[in-house]
Amino acid sequence: TQKFLSITIIKILMFAPKKMFKKDEFYKYAVKHRGISSLTLHRYQSRWYGSMTPYIIEERQLNVAQMDVFSRLMMDRIIFLGTGIDDQVANIVEAQLLFLESVDAKRDITIYINSPGGSVYAGLGIYDTMQFVKPDISTVCTGIAASMGAVLQCAGTKGKRAALKHARIMIHQPLGGAEGPASDIEITAREIQKLKKELYEIIAHHTGQPYKKIWQDADRDFWMTAEESKAYGMIDEVLIGKKS
């Protein structure tokens, strides 16, 4: 019976040319040092990877190792953000970034983004961690990077942000609502305005676009193709396969 190994990291024995990590090392790091419960990890992996996760088998000098493809890619410092952004997702991605930094602070980390966005607060946690860790962060949009996903896409290291040919990137103003006493509604409205200003400043900083233009464009859903995203400054390169 196959066991679902969502974030299992297995060290390549003897022949590892780069610094690798031992089996279950990220799992232990997330639980013991980042305070992420095993239940949260299980829920995250079940929602993200699902039951159709492909497994690969690698022949090693001393054994044969089986792991899911996402764990194998993480060994190459590749993180997938392929779902909506909430607190649980943010906790895992932040832990992955910090873990990979602890393994090797000089090698780049790549984040593949295919996300419709989600919680602004959770997304800002990922954003701040991306800016905090020492390795350069390469971002690649595969499919869609919308709302908070677009903010994370443009927040990669300058010169290392890319999108596939038919990807779409969308920015807009933050959404929110409130109910209750008028004073509470006013408090929420002020907070949304603060978040709006903060997000627009982040996008302006990473794209080089004037803050006023971001304010105007993001008033409603502002969709961009990969080429348009490059011209806008959201990415630096459009990735086109050799078969194109």
Language-model features: locations:
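Terminal-region recognition feature
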Residues: I12-S244
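Compositionally biased low-complexity segments, especially N-terminal hydrophobic helices
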Residues: T8-I9
